[in-house]
Amino acid sequence: IFARTLDVFTANMSESIEKTIDISRILKSKMGAKAKFVPSFLVSWLKKTVHEDEVNRFLWESRHLQGTEWLTECVKYLKMNIQLEGVENLPDKNDGKLYTFVSNHPLGGQDGVALGSIIGTHYDGKFRYLVNDLLLNLPGLKPVSIGINKTGRQSRDFPRMVEAGFQSDNHMLMFPAGLNSRKQPDGSIRDLPWKKTFIS
């Protein structure tokens, strides 16, 4: 009985510490050999800042969900209270057309998750984000994302990747500022200048 209990405890412990988001691994994948020069205190700070343990716990508990269902679960987990106005202005999902939804980015992850949940629910999951490729580390988000590497060689492929997204049978959701809004010298919080694309 003791051995069986120990086996179950060990299995549960292994499950509980399984990491989907591993800051050290992500740094190494993005920086290669240079990652070893990042001070350990900075790595620890990054882990605390992104709430690595809490995020991994949520990802583990929601691992059976993807796309719109996962985004809606994120809304619940973050205890967001969303009040919708103007839903009647969203185009009919059965009109046979594809739409591009362009938004400012005041909060970053929170508004991205909320909009994805709303658009995904309205259009039966048929949408795609254009996102920073780091977000592809989130398994539930990956199926509805087109990852853009903003710093590496892939950034030159941005037009091609955007074109591929727009040629699909999905609606598109994008944040042209590329980053969440920033506090301005006058105290207001506004988007950075939107990056030029053929729709912004």
Where are these regions (language model features)?
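Membrane-anchoring hydrophobic helices of lipid-metabolizing enzymes
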Residues: 9-99, 110-114, 124, 142
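Soluble catalytic domains of membrane acyltransferases
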Residues: 81-200
